[in-house]
Amino acid sequence: MTFTEAQIKRYARHILLQEVGGEGQAKLLRSRVLVVGAGGLGSPLLLYLAAAGVGTLGVVDDDVVDLSNLQRQIVHSTAAIGSPKVESAKRTLAGINPEVTVRTHQTRIGPENALDLIAGYDVVADGTDNFATRFLVNDACYFAGKTLVSAAILRFDAQVYTFKAHLADERGDHGPCYRCLFREAPPEGQIPTCAEAGVLGALCGMVGSLQATEVLKELLGIGASLSGSLIVCDGLGATFRKIKVKADPGCPLCGEAPSIADLSRHAA
């Protein structure tokens, strides 16, 4: 594609990178990413994807901005309190990069709409704060054949992972899905939420930025994919660990004899 002078200036630091260049930046401008959740992780994720020039960003969230969100959800402002999060995020992203198309989905993702929501996107990024939605998004991405970059955070601890179990190599081997790591969601109430246990706001920014980096790498096809690995962050200890994870042959979703054939198990 031919860049305008403004685009050359806006994306100059990307174009200078040998691994990106003009071809890579053009690929980003054609790319489509769905971000599930416009909260603590979704905020920095959306900001950096928009700044990077990802051409189309979808935002799924049914919540409204609350004062308690602003300690970490930096895509929203005090003036946006009471507004739908998807609309607040769209306004902020337009101010950062008006070239980006932002599609708002003011709804809760569920088994009845998940496949339709993710169908029009290349990569899905999950920044939600509950196990039920993480399992749903994982299952939906597997069935739809979409790469999923997911993150989770609580208190001072976080995890980031990429799942693309739908892609097999020439030997038929594939990476893990979320269910290969955690077979089922824990009983409701067993693991506290951020609203119950708290979360360090700045850590959301760091982890969301790392998640954005992994999304950009997947879109560009550069670097080492996190598929097959799990990054564990200890904010208090200032440590990162990269743990190898393998596909589980007994996984009920992507294993050798899967028992999950659709999203019906997620129905209320």
Please identify what each model-predicted range represents.
Residues M1-A268:
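Adenine nucleotide-associated cytosolic modules
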